[in-house]
Amino acid sequence: MSVKEGAQRKWAALKEKLGPQDSDPTEANLESADPELCIRLLQMPSVVNYSGLRKRLEGSDGGWMVQFLEQSGLDLLLEALARLSGRGVARISDALLQLTCVSCVRAVMNSRQGIEYILSNQGYVRQLSQALDTSNVMVKKQVFELLAALCIYSPEGHVLTLDALDHYKTVCSQQYRFSIVMNELSGSDNVPYVVTLLSVINAVILGPEDLRARTQLRNEFIGLQLLDVLARLRDLEDADLLIQLEAFEEAKAEDEEELLRVSGGVDMSSHQEVFASLFHKVSCSPVSAQLLSVLQGLLHLEPTLRSSQLLWEALESLVNRAVLLASDAQECTLEEVVERLLSVKGRPRPSPLVKAHKSVQANLDQSQRGSSPQNTTTPKPSVEGQQPAAAAACEPVDHAQSESILKVSQPRALEQQASTPPPPPPPPLLPGSSAEPPPPPPPPPLPSVGAKALPTAPPPPPLPGLGAMAPPAPPLPPPLPGSCEFLPPPPPPLPGLGCPPPPPPLLPGMGWGPPPPPPPLLPCTCSPPVAGGMEEVIVAQVDHGLGSAWVPSHRRVNPPTLRMKKLNWQKLPSNVAREHNSMWASLSSPDAEAVEPDFSSIERLFSFPAAKPKEPTMVAPRARKEPKEITFLDAKKSLNLNIFLKQFKCSNEEVAAMIRAGDTTKFDVEVLKQLLKLLPEKHEIENLRAFTEERAKLASADHFYLLLLAIPCYQLRIECMLLCEGAAAVLDMVRPKAQLVLAACESLLTSRQLPIFCQLILRIGNFLNYGSHTGDADGFKISTLLKLTETKSQQNRVTLLHHVLEEAEKSHPDLLQLPRDLEQPSQAAGINLEIIRSEASSNLKKLLETERKVSASVAEVQEQYTERLQASISAFRALDELFEAIEQKQRELADYLCEDAQQLSLEDTFSTMKAFRDLFLRALKENKDRKEQAAKAERRKQQLAEEEARRPRGEDGKPVRKGPGKQEEVCVIDALLADIRKGFQLRKTARGRGDTDGGSKAASMDPPRATEPVATSNPAGDPVGSTRCPASEPGLDATTASESRGWDLVDAVTPGPQPTLEQLEEGGPRPLERRSSWYVDASDVLTTEDPQCPQPLEGAWPVTLGDAQALKPLKFSSNQPPAAGSSRQDAKDPTSLLGVLQAEADSTSEGLEDAVHSRGARPPAAGPGGDEDEDEEDTAPESALDTSLDKSFSEDAVTDSSGSGTLPRARGRASKGTGKRRKKRPSRSQEEVPPDSDDNKTKKLCVIQ
């Protein structure tokens, strides 16, 4: 079997194993498909369909892309991406499907029409962000790249990206909008993915032009522990990661420097410095009290709660508004200032009448929630409709006064009614009327407690229910509780309005309709009328809030005389049962039929039976059992003693023998302390000694006590055992600490490197402080060593200590051994000398006292413990001498360091030395790391310089860009990401140059030369081109920029200055407005002219790349570009232009990485012997700027357009010896010719390096 037949069999077996896949005949030719067909295929998601669509999107022109977008192609892609992200990636096919889907979205955004269409709709970016809710790291990497590109594309893109992150936070229930970024950054070890996340952070921070906005965004990330994560990432060895880290640090340093200059020397990134500056400003003014109150209030906000986060954001917004209002010089009251702070833009300010109405309504709503539901308020529209009539009928009342009366009237009424007996009640009031309480003194007019009638009465008399004053009615007897049920039934009232005027008079409290039972009428203090007649509602609430003893008839029952069994029911809430439409509310009406149950039978049947008294019975007394054990101890103590004895696992006699012999092998300090607590008390001793029966009857604990009492001086023996054991433990703990403190003092006094280092710091400090009151110093306090890191240099992450160590490494290498001299003081840090000395002194006193007791005890005890006590006393006296030596060294150290001997704390001194030693070692490590990073950056810079040197150059010495000649549009996303991977170099160039430099460069631009028109469209009028190598559109027909401000896709598509007046007069389109700092020229890496065609064409417009700067077209010596005739045949064949590059773009296992790599490799030159040149150029290394999509995939997967399967393939290309006919591709210097009228589907490539 030949090798070829074996390969064919393997191929067939693999296809059979993979199984049949859904394929469509049109998928193989999607390059010529119209948008409608592509959208139809989108409804059948598959890797083959998405791959074919991606190639079609990359090769489409502007018109085709617009049709695709207008037919909701992007909507289908985003919906499919969200659906695929939601169902997980259980299989590799799901992951590939997600990856190819997001690559289609990227292909859409690569075109100017696509990205502008996305930015025109907020929902698209939100949908894109929802694709982050997946476990597929490659998909998340692609989405994050798209969001980063949107951030730097335009201010609108930056705003929409932040909005999308806010939306994702809400949808996924996260606490902060940047939590998704920081969580992925903290939990990922995939270096390319980490680089992408850092690029997102940089793009978000560097997006806004406003310094304060950038600082705020950066502080949000820092608040999520970004600096700690960056410190960990610096240890990773990756060049692309280093670029992003440097971009973050450099931008942070620049912003801090600018902020320091703007804020007058205050470090606005330091909470302490900002607060110190604020406190210094207000400390001598009455405003300090308000500042203290604000701080006290903020102290109660817990930052971990989600509601607190919203409150902090609201407070920040209020402070920003307060800063804006502070510049307003107009004088206004406190209420007006608060109103202006809380006012919403675009909402008209309410008039005083409306504010009064709203305040009443707010109080009403609050009182309703806290009171009984009997009070049914009038609907808001009715109240608002009655305002004009109320204003005409009522006397004007001051708004502020009415509000204050409203706030205090109800509590005051309750207090008065609760504390004083009720006076004679007023007469019953007619609906809508009002009366005055009986004098003296005359209070404000009492509004009606009845219902408000509809405003249908004739205009002359005051309308009922509107608070009009009525003459007092003749007095009537007070109503009795429950008398309302004998009234004739009124007609059904309107909801919440009570009865209209025609019904008969109602007693007070009945105006709200039949359901609520009326309370007894008691006088109350009421407020004067308020706008809208709402005071009636408030008065009714006050009356009702007093409660009522009246009970409806259907609820009245007689109390039972016996204890009844309970009915297990579920009570309805009162506010539900008393609704006027409910069945229970209808039972309270006077005309309801009363049903009286037979309570006597119920009481007889459902009461608990009476307990019968127990009859005394003669029970024979039980014979008293003799107790098995006799104990004189209480149960708790006996239990504790038994537990204590069981731990020895021996008999009581053995335990007593060990105590008698002073054996401490089984007695440690804690056991002896517990035994002392369990010793028998005086009464227990007397009882045990009086016991004369058999000891076998005693309990175990009592038996142990008898054995213990038989030992002479048993308590003193136990105390001696405890003291000897405790003294040994104290010596083992205290003596090493005291010796270490003494050695640390000696180490500081004898260190050779410390004085030399301090001398170096002294000279540097005098140089820095020269001419100030802190200059010309003879020395400094030792705590100054900790402040060396507070003096920061202009270089990023370099402090004075870093610089001193760099100088010491060069000139005084011995000083780097200083941490060795400070090792013992660092170890002694944290030892409190006072505590250990007091503990040693107390033990010595106990030993001396115990020795005195032993000397007066029996001879056996003296023989056992005198020698042991003497040894412990000698050891503690030696320890006391050690403390005396430490005191002497402390005085010497105080003199050595020029400190006060009485105030010098050895603990603080050693802690200072430990902190300084840690700073010293950390600075050494950071200096070493910075040197290594600088060396890596230098090697990378040399690599880029070598790559730049290998690029061909034109007559003016500038690099010449090779590739398809008609570069009418650029791949926006790829170009932006190329600049991001370079560390935002173009943005740095713009900021470093400034507006003045930019203006001078713009003024020095060469004037546009005479140009010739170039055919850019087919006869049918359809634009031809591609989004990867886009077709011509109005205003997009040129390929190069001016000589001084040229652009190259290596750097990015970037906006530049506005076109000159001459360019505008020639009819070129005006670029869109965009921030001046984004994407301006990088002329050192940009090609501007074709060396063979130094003159531009006639009549061509300058190119506007999105909102980029105007570019000049190439000039050809004839109407056709060079070598156009030789390449026309190749241009007609799309495959001849794609070649191996198109095959690489089809890879799906690494997603878009291959596409980026294929765009990064330029087409080789075709000519005589072109095969050798082609191989030589194809084997060139890939650009170091490209990051892989996912390095966990070791092989690429190729999916052909016919759906035959997904196969692994190697990266290498077929060698020349395979016999395959290699397709000829145009050289990079060749320019493509406009295709014939019958072929407008020509594939073009957008070459991105």
UniProtKB/Swiss-Prot annotation:
Impact when changing residue 184 to K: In CMTDIE and FSGS5
Residue intervals of the GBD/FH3 domain: 2-330
Residue numbers bearing the Phosphothreonine modification: 1179, 1199, 1206
Domain WH2 residues, every copy: 974-989
Keyword Cytoplasm set for record: yes
Modified residues (N-acetylserine): 2
GO molecular function: actin binding; small GTPase binding
InterPro entries for the chain: ARM-like, ARM-type_fold, FH2_Formin, FH2_Formin_sf, FH3_dom, GBD/FH3_dom, GTPase-bd, WH2_dom
Polar residues biased stretches: 360-380
Entry coiled-coil feature ranges: 874-951
Keywords: Acetylation, Actin-binding, Charcot-Marie-Tooth disease, Coiled coil, Cytoplasm, Disease variant, Neurodegeneration, Neuropathy, Phosphoprotein
UniProt biased composition (Pro residues): 420-447, 471-489
Subcellular location: Cytoplasm, Perinuclear region
Modified residues (Phosphoserine): 351, 1147, 1149, 1192, 1194
Residue stretches making up the FH2 domain: 554-946
GO cellular component terms, A-Z: actin filament; perinuclear region of cytoplasm
Residue spans of biased composition, Basic and acidic residues class: 1067-1076
Ranges of Basic residues composition bias in the record: 1210-1227
Span list, region Disordered: 1-29, 347-489, 928-966, 988-1076, 1112-1249
Tissue expression as described in the entry: Widely expressed. In the kidney, expression is apparent in podocytes and some tubule cells.
Subunit organization: Interacts with actin at the FH2 domain. Interacts with DAAM2.
Implicated disorder: Focal segmental glomerulosclerosis 5: A renal pathology defined by the presence of segmental sclerosis in glomeruli and resulting in proteinuria, reduced glomerular filtration rate and progressive decline in renal function. Renal insufficiency often progresses to end-stage renal disease, a highly morbid state requiring either dialysis therapy or kidney transplantation. Charcot-Marie-Tooth disease, dominant intermediate E: A form of Charcot-Marie-Tooth disease, a disorder of the peripheral nervous system, characterized by progressive weakness and atrophy, initially of the peroneal muscles and later of the distal muscles of the arms. The dominant intermediate type E is characterized by clinical and pathologic features intermediate between demyelinating and axonal peripheral neuropathies, and motor median nerve conduction velocities ranging from 25 to 45 m/sec.
Function according to Swiss-Prot or TrEMBL: Severs actin filaments and accelerates their polymerization and depolymerization.
Entry comment, domain topic: The WH2 domain acts as the DAD (diaphanous autoregulatory) domain and binds to actin monomers. Regulated by autoinhibition due to intramolecular GBD-DAD binding.
Protein's UniProt name: Inverted formin-2
Organism, as annotated: Homo sapiens (Human)
